[in-house]
Amino acid sequence: MTLQETGCRENYPVAIVIVANLVSFLIYGIGACILYSFGLIWVVGYILFILLLEFRVMGWHCVDCYYYGKTCAFGKGQVSRIFFSRGRPERFNQKTMNWKDIVPDFLVFIIPILAGILLLIQEFTWPIFSLVIVLFLLGFLGNALVRGHLACRCCKQREIGCPAAQLFDTKKTT
């Protein structure tokens, strides 16, 4: 079966990379805006946490991925090549993933949402309320749409074997 027959992409179009990263950067930006209400040190900590997560993904996952050195839906295959040496592709689909593994990724938007709720309890303002709602929608729906319709559905690594795809597979039988 060829990539075209499976619907898999060898390299993703730049438009998909832009949309996928736009969702992430909006989450990061809105999260930083909310946390700024608590002080600049919270924003710095938040940004360092995000950078740590990004380097963790690129250093531990992207290096073994089919898209290492290629344009994946998030562009990280190209970026990881700059910072890290090629890993072992056969190792990628041998990895396992559970819900604990993705908690840090959820914390990127849940911490600012909780901080925003705390601000709203202290004093309700429409701007903070709006940011919390938008962040909630981007964090859950935005990520689900990007991964479900733009990224994972057309991913060659998913076809080869991906622990995240296995975790989120709603058709699996137990």
Language-model segments: residues:
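Core segments of transmembrane alpha-helices
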Residues: 21-28, 95-117
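Short membrane-interface loop/juxtamembrane segments of multi-pass integral membrane proteins
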Residues: 74-100
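Cys/His-coordinated zinc-binding microdomains
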Residues: 66-69, 76, 156-159, 163-166
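Short, amphipathic, aromatic/basic-enriched membrane-interface segments that mark the entry/exit
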Residues: 6-18, 33-34, 98-103, 123-124
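Cytosolic-side membrane-entry/anchor segment at the start of a transmembrane helix
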Residues: 1-28, 174
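Short, hydrophobic transmembrane alpha-helix segments
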Residues: 28-40
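Hydrophobic alpha-helical membrane-embedded segments
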Residues: 37-70, 138-147
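Alpha-helical transmembrane segments and their immediate juxtamembrane interface regions
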Residues: 121-164
